[in-house]
Swiss-Prot record:
This is 1-deoxy-D-xylulose 5-phosphate reductoisomerase. Pfam families: DXP_redisom_C, DXP_reductoisom, DXPR_C. It comes from Neisseria meningitidis serogroup A / serotype 4A (strain DSM 15465 / Z2491). Catalyzes the NADPH-dependent rearrangement and reduction of 1-deoxy-D-xylulose-5-phosphate (DXP) to 2-C-methyl-D-erythritol 4-phosphate (MEP). Its EC number is 1.1.1.267. GO terms for molecular function: 1-deoxy-D-xylulose-5-phosphate reductoisomerase activity; manganese ion binding; NADPH binding. Mn(2+) binds at residues 152, 154, 228. SUPFAM superfamilies: 1-deoxy-D-xylulose-5-phosphate reductoisomerase, C-terminal domain, Glyceraldehyde-3-phosphate dehydrogenase-like, C-terminal domain, NAD(P)-binding Rossmann-fold domains. Gene3D superfamilies: 1.10.1740.10, NAD(P)-binding Rossmann-like Domain. Belongs to the DXR family.
């Protein structure tokens, strides 16, 4: 059996580490061609020692020099590259069959698009790719025969319970709606009067999942679920009015599909990203992920509730951007990334994140942008607007 040759973008993040854990369990099935790890050079060097990729990519020349020194010390022959073009190169290399797109934020878009242009199998964990450029990305993938497999636990759950021959037309398969579950994050029951004083350390402590700091804050505001709504819209060709969100604090049911006959099919499992990663990497097989069995005896009640927009205004803003379409999701994402970075840096309050996003969505912007240059230009304009607004909040 010829192993699948992988590029893993974002290998030092939580998704990347989980991917490598799954890969390590199946050395006969996978070979790592390239790893990309931004600035965590020590962790990336250790990964290179273990998986021996041809290439490792970091953010800039300074971090490249540090990584080269570590690899030379350890006798590892991996070639070091740096910069945005290097990400594109390792994602689109002829030797590569599959690309794990796990870079956080819109910065991951060009490399994901490059993989789509080369017809790769894309394991999509970077939700911003579809939020910012859904129409462009999906059309590029279709035109070049690229397979787009969702790694996000919610979308992967939907993917697992949709009919195998799903054509992207809900009515043909008797589908009434797609339901994304959300944990509600660490502040689901907190007093709203305390939200102004929430600290970054509090916001990144997710009750169920192990995630990076930015995504953890997005979970706390439920912007993460808002971005996932937009992602589901593009992945499954699902109209906005057929998408639902339900809060499920236990994170055991990862998402559901409601059918016209009254049936609801759900995917359940322990909250561990290795499950959706293994499902995508192993298709059409089911391969070992290293995740333990779900223990039904140990489960208490499974509970559900509707999201409260007063508690989670970012989710409401995401609904509005999805319904508006055009460049609105791009603006939503750029403003949120700028605001979350400012919050994590101690510049603004937790409640200022939604205020910043709302401000940017109220500005004038193009109704629709059809190329990556225009999308990245709008992204840059919105970030500048967000930074200017943040300056008024200090």
């Amino acid at each position: 059996m010829t192993p699948q040759v992988l590029t893993i973008l974002g290998s030092t993040g939580s998704i990347g580490e989980s991917t490598l854990d799954v890969v390590s369990r199946h050395p006969e099935k996978f070979r790592v061609f390239a790893l990309a790890g931004h600035k965590q050079v020590e962790k990336l060097a250790a990964q290179c020692q273990t998986f021996h990729p041809e290439y490792a990519v970091v953010a800039d020349a300074e971090h490249a020099a540090r990584l080269e020194a570590l690899l030379k010390r350890d006798g590892t022959a991996t070639q070091v590259l740096h910069g945005a073009q290097a990400l594109v190169d390792v994602a689109s290399a002829d030797e590569v069959s599959g690309v794990m797109c796990a870079i956080v934020g819109a910065v991951g878009l060009p490399s994901a698009l490059a993989a789509a242009q080369k017809g790769k199998t894309i394991y999509l964990a970077n939700k911003e790719t579809l939020v910012v450029s859904g129409a462009l990305f999906m059309e590029t993938a279709r035109a070049n025969g690229a397979a787009v497999l969702p790694v996000d636990s919610e979308h992967n759950a939907v993917f697992q319970v949709l009919p195998r021959d799903y054509t992207g037309r809900l009515n043909e398969h008797g589908i009434a709606s797609i339901i994304l579950t959300a944990s509600g994050g660490p502040f689901l029951t907190a007093d709203l009067n305390t939200f102004d004083s929430i600290t970054p350390d509090q916001a990144v402590k997710h009750p169920n999942w192990r995630m990076g700091r930015k995504i953890s804050v997005d979970s706390a505001t439920m912007m993460n679920k808002g971005l996932e709504l937009i992602e589901a819209h593009w992945l499954f060709n699902c109209p906005p009015d057929k998408l639902e969100v339900v809060i499920h604090p236990q994170s055991v049911i990862h998402s559901m599909v409601r059918y016209r006959d009254g049936s609801v099919l759900a995917q359940l499992g322990n909250p561990d990203m290795r499950t959706p990663i293994a499902y995508c990497l192993g298709l059409p097989e089911r391969i070992d992920s290293g995740v333990g069995d779900l223990d039904f005896d140990a489960l208490s009640a499974l509970t559900f509730q509707k999201p409260d927009f007063d508690r989670f205004p970012c989710l409401k803003l995401a609904y509005e951007a999805m319904n508006a379409g055009g460049a609105a999701p791009c603006v939503l994402n750029a403003a949120n990334e700028a605001a979350v970075a400012a919050f994590l840096d101690g510049q603004i309050k937790f409640t200022d994140i939604a205020k910043t996003v709302a401000h940017c969505l109220s500005q004038d912007f193009s109704d629709g942008i059809g190329d990556i240059g225009g999308l990245l230009a709008q992204d840059a304009r919105t970030r500048a607007q967000a930074r200017a607004f943040i300056g008024t909040l200090r």
